[in-house]
C-alpha cells in the first residue's frame, strides 16, 4: 500500500534508521519500473535484487548509498548468486531489453490482466492489487486459496498461494492472447 511505504520511509528518516528495499522479486521490471520503490517516490539506503537481473539465471546485486556503503566490509558477505560469465552475458541482454517502452508495456499488461480478472466478477475473488505483472488476488471468506489454485493448475493456469490470497507472476513477455487464455481458464473453472 503506497501510504504504508511512504510512512515507513518517513519513520526511517526521522529515526535515522536504514531503509532497505528487498527487490529480489519486485525488481528489474516486474512492477513496470526498474525497481518497485521508484513507484512510491522513496529512495532506500540499500536495494537488493536478483532473479530478473539475469533472466532467472543466478545473479544478484546490492546497491547502497553513502550512509551504509561501509556496513559490509571485504569478506563479510558471500553469495551463491554472484554470477559467472554466462550469467553476466544474460544480465547484459536484460539491461538492453529494459527500455522505457518495455516497462510501460509491463504496466499496461498488468492493468489489462487486473481489469480482466475483476470483470469476470468471480464469486471467490474479492479484489486484485499490485504493480505491473506482480498481481495479488484477495480470496473472499468461505473460499480456500489452495483449492482455487489447485483447480486452476489442473486446467493449465499456474498461480501461487500467498497467505489467504493468490499471486500471479506471469513472464514479462506474456502476450495478450496468453492473458486472454488465462482469463478464460479462470472463467471456465471458477464461475
Per-segment meaning from a language model:
Residues 1-191:
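Conserved N-terminal phosphate-binding loop of PLP-dependent enzymes in the Aspartate aminotransferase
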